[in-house]
Amino acid sequence: MLSFDYSIPTKVFFGKGKIDVIGEEIKKYGSRVLIVYGGGSIKRNGIYDRATAILKENNIAFYELSGVEPNPRITTVKKGIEICRENNVDLVLAIGGGSAIDCSKVIAAGVYYDGDTWDMVKDPSKITKVLPIASILTLSATGSEMDQIAVISNMETNEKLGVGHDDMRPKFSVLDPTYTFTVPKNQTAAGTADIMSHTFESYFSGVEGAYVQDGIAEAILRTCIKYGKIAMEKTDDYEARANLMWASSLAINGLLSLGKDRKWSCHPMEHELSAYYDITHGVGLAILTPNWMEYILNDDTLHKFVSYGINVWGIDKNKDNYEIAREAIKNTREYFNSLGIPSKLREVGIGKDKLELMAKQAVRNSGGTIGSLRPINAEDVLEIFKKSY
């Protein structure tokens, strides 16, 4: 296990009715707020009305940025920055899932950057100051409610990039599982796949000896496997929604990657799919993951897949190691299929003509390779894309 520094300062208010705290919490940072949200579901399910009522009760002025895309775009970020500057906003409040929160993070950082915001996304060292950020979570998926990363798309350049800064962690986040009762089944499925993929990225590391972190990762994966199906079948099951919501936060808030390197595999590949074809992130990850697993399985990586098969899927440890590994990968594929997620890239509109270009793009920002357990290059990525097609 590598050395590390540990600090996850986001304050979490978890449970039914926890939205009531936002007035007092926001007033610690000021009295002018930008609310950032997506397509309007928060108005239909009452969250918007409750949040704005609390703001009014506490004499907090608020402004709005709606219409944040599922893959939030830099053009939308720039609109939010202008609203903040024009109204001297003190805090950015995201109400929604990872898209709204990611958009809010880059707005909050961009307020203090005088150049082109996209340049700041490409080079996070340009971030010098960030407005306070808070979130009210309505979708269990990205874990953005507790981490310092945002992912933003530029449709003009076909780029989807991650940007991070310690001050981009939300000051506080409200996690009320009842707010996810109305999430459609397809979004629940994609969100569950996203949580599992975040966990896989830390779990399948080339760094050995992080026993505690791996044990937590295995528990999160078992949680997703159990409660993802339950949440699909009974959308208002509180325990299912609560466990998925907490798993979402723990999967990517930094805990699982402590003492490990942070060289991810499937996310850089999927970001290219989303950048060019604007597909649902979790769907792309679910398609790629089993094929990536099959591709990197060899004598050197076998031990990790054996642990995964035994500790997550409960496969008999007395079986042959390769049999355990292949059964674990097969179970992963079948689980995503059971959630109703497409299994082929062609099913979600990906064109064959761009596979080679996207493979090269996937490794361009990481020295030509991605991944930790078994690093892969552009040629490897192309083969995984072909296997997934």
From Swiss-Prot:
Please state what class of enzyme this protein is.
oxidoreductase
Ordered alphabetically, the record's keywords are: NAD, Oxidoreductase
Query: Assembly and interactions?
Result: Homodimer.
| Species | Clostridium acetobutylicum (strain ATCC 824 / DSM 792 / JCM 1419 / IAM 19013 / LMG 5710 / NBRC 13948 / NRRL B-527 / VKM B-1787 / 2291 / W)
Q: Which family does it belong to?
A: Belongs to the iron-containing alcohol dehydrogenase family.
Give the organism's phylogenetic lineage: Bacteria, Bacillati, Bacillota, Clostridia, Eubacteriales
Pathway membership of this protein? Alcohol metabolism; butanol biosynthesis
Its EC number(s): 1.1.1.-
Q: Give the UniProt entry's GO cellular component terms.
A: cytosol
| BP GO annotations | 1-butanol biosynthetic process
Q: What is the protein named?
A: NADH-dependent butanol dehydrogenase A
